[in-house]
């Protein structure tokens, strides 16, 4: 056939074949990258007797829509259909035993896929970016799903992993953003903690009894209930009281649980993994005193909860925190963040911080100039400075003007009351041309180096 280079039963190059093509009888293998230049190929029929597709055999056949595979096929090489972005449906023959790494990488139009019995392994990145794939039936012969195998399959809605499956790799279903439920079989022994990372629509996990995993209210735990593995990001739960007996919060366990409003940890929790609470919607999480290991980025990011802790060493590992202790217990470098945490706790009604009020008021007195410079923009801080009795008379006009501009009569009343108690009569308003004019607001200095400032209300 013109343009096809065939020797010893191997089709080594298809040249620039275009349109529909039937590979002739007698070809037993397709060589590595044999069709990689065929960007105008649209349909392909492979003959009976063919047993092997080489690595990257149809790489970048961007217009290839349909492929008929023979029953005799035994091996599909790595990346065989990589970037075949127009491929819509494919029936794999029963003689295959594995789907190699990157086999269907980037097949964005693939909506139907039949994976036959006999397949025992699905390789890394095998179906990455198959964003149109809605349903997936996996055979009972399957034993392993490797790293990122179904990553980015954004239309996949439900997933039942078959009995017999033993291992699911890292980020195997990462970014499957339509996936709503996952059922885990009793046979599953290895599940990477971030296997379902980024599955933002996931509402529940289900696990067969007697296996390595268990579920309570759709939340995934180890079978012995000592490790909380994953809270589904789209769970209907608004409060999660982690059961007594849990000792570890796995990496990314509450990642992206933006609708969750309250998380309660038992006192026995000893370890909290990386990114455990990143993006969780709870305002705060109280850390237990038994805590032995806290990953540096467990609460990373401005949209994560505030950690409440009573241990200076734990506080030193946090980006933002409420410290249940005297601020003088902390090293100097942590005190700006601790003061910010105290103000946040006062604003949000965290009751335990009231025990340390005297310590923080003394800190505000000692650092008066530092905090006065931005009190006009932070009402909680302003009220604390008034309570600490450190606002000088020359600052009152600007603070009163700021309160008026923000239409906060409560702050205005507090400032006037403070002025009367400490300095006598209230200052007269400024008058220009017969009209009353507010005093200018002093430009606030940069806030302390703390992630609490500039984040807005949660």
Language model features: what each stretch is:
Residues 1-29, 39-52, 62-75, 85-98, ...:
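Structural signature of tandem-repeat unit edges
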Residues 32-34, 54-57, 77-82, 100-103, ...:
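Consensus positions within tandem repeat domains that build extended binding/scaffold surfaces
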Residues 416, 420, 427-448, 452-458:
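Long, compositionally biased eukaryotic scaffolding/regulatory segments
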Residues 378, 408-412:
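Ankyrin-repeat interhelical turn/loop motif and analogous interhelical turns
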